[in-house]
Amino acid sequence: MSGHSKWATIKRKKAVTDQKRGSLFTKLVKEITIAAKMGGGDPAGNPRLRLAIDTARDNSMPMDNIQRAIKKGTGELEGVTWDEITYEGYGPAGIALIIETATDNRNRTVADIRHIMSRNNGSLGESGSVAWMFQRKGTLDVPRSAAGEDQLMELLLEAGLEDLGSDDENYFTVITDVKDLERVKKALDDAAIMYENAKIDLIPENYIELEAEDARKVIKLIDAFENNDDVQAVYTNMEISESAMSSLNE
């Protein structure tokens, strides 16, 4: 499951660029608001909210913004009601796509999703058409400079480690059951081991390996989704061949 890190490496680099976009805080505020609405405003008893707050802090969101988002979720402040809707479909070369959205206008969002698909050689599928290809997991990245593979295995197995991706030259990818992600984070915190990008992820059971031309088309499609304010996250079973990596990095 975790041996496919070339697309993960590109996603990590893309995230640095995405952080410069004005839509990042909008997406983070939505997630905090939704999490607070669903599970209450106390992060100690709401793992989804706790993770959302941690992500916001990691991206330098001011605490005032975080608190306002929480209060909008709990109803203490007036705010927009967000509906979470997940779309499924296929992109170039038959790769599977899951698009998670949070919207205040369902008709606008589905029209936007269809438009983006049609302009980028994709097609919208029925609910359940590709979801069975993915597993929901907790993931985070540990820089190789922070810990060794044996050290992480020994430390995290009892905390709930399921898999440790080691193909990336700069990071280990820790994969856990969703319910164990907080335990794994605490184990790393207690050991003073730095980590990044802790999140709930959708990981494909199997990957479709693409060459550079098709990979570029898929990345263009994903970029179009991620530039839409209603889209919170995009998942795919694309993997990029070794021969395509050098071309994509040019």
From Swiss-Prot:
Any single biological process term in GO: regulation of DNA-templated transcription
Subcellular location: Cytoplasm
Stored InterPro entries: Integrase-like_N (IPR017856), TACO1_YebC-like_2nd/3rd_dom (IPR048300), TACO1_YebC_N (IPR049083), Transcrip_reg_TACO1-like (IPR002876), Transcrip_reg_TACO1-like_dom3 (IPR026564), YebC-like (IPR029072)
Record-level GO cellular component terms: cytosol
SUPFAM superfamilies with a match to the protein in the record: YebC-like (SSF75625)
Keyword Transit peptide: no
UniProt superkingdom: Bacteria
UniProt keywords, alphabetically: Cytoplasm, DNA-binding, Transcription, Transcription regulation
Transferase as UniProt keyword: no
Main location: cytoplasm
GO molecular function, one term: DNA binding
Family recorded in the similarity comment: Belongs to the TACO1 family.
Name this polypeptide is given: Probable transcriptional regulatory protein Ppha_0657
Originating organism: Pelodictyon phaeoclathratiforme (strain DSM 5477 / BU-1)
